[in-house]
Amino acid sequence: MKKVDLHIHTVPSISDRDFFFSLNSLKDYVEKLELDCIAITNHNLFDKTQFEYISKELSIKVFPGIEIDLEAGHILLISENEDLQDFDLKCKKVTRLIKSKSDYITYEQLIEIFTSLSKYLLIPHYDKKPNIKVETLEKLGDNIFCGEVTSIRKFKACLTESDK
């Protein structure tokens, strides 16, 4: 079984409490949990330079990503490492649109910026606040095949409930 953490924050934004990122702490975390890969998913921003640095420093696969405030909920959008420049430009559009804690982008803006959602791994806050609205999940349709919960207990509960 592979161990992954696809929700790592490394840069504080307006959506976060202030924190200090430490590469050594990240290395310790990866080693202690024996992770096989991670994704860097800061709130509404992507720091390409920092991502490249972290990728070189870690011995595991690191995916580029962004956690987007989407229609008052949150969604992780994770990319391949193939065209970082294009991903960076798209993420900068999100950053320009979200200037305060109450700002978010619409589904239409998400499509306008990232065009082909099937190129990305999309992970909505499902049973975790701020969760994505059912209407937004329906719009995302087949592009969603997993969700994020806050605990192992909630994950196990979701596995046993057929309507989730």
Model-derived segments and spans:
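An N-terminally biased module of ancient metal coordination in phosphate/nucleic-acid-related enzymes
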Residues: 1-72
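Domain-core and long-helix interface of multi-subunit machines
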Residues: 3-21, 49, 88-164
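Ordered hydrophobic segments in well-structured contexts
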Residues: 37, 75-78, 121-123, 146
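Short, glycine/serine-rich, charged loops/turns that create anion-binding
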Residues: 44, 82, 127
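A basic- and aromatic-enriched beta-loop-alpha substructure that forms the phosphate/nucleotide-
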Residues: 67-100
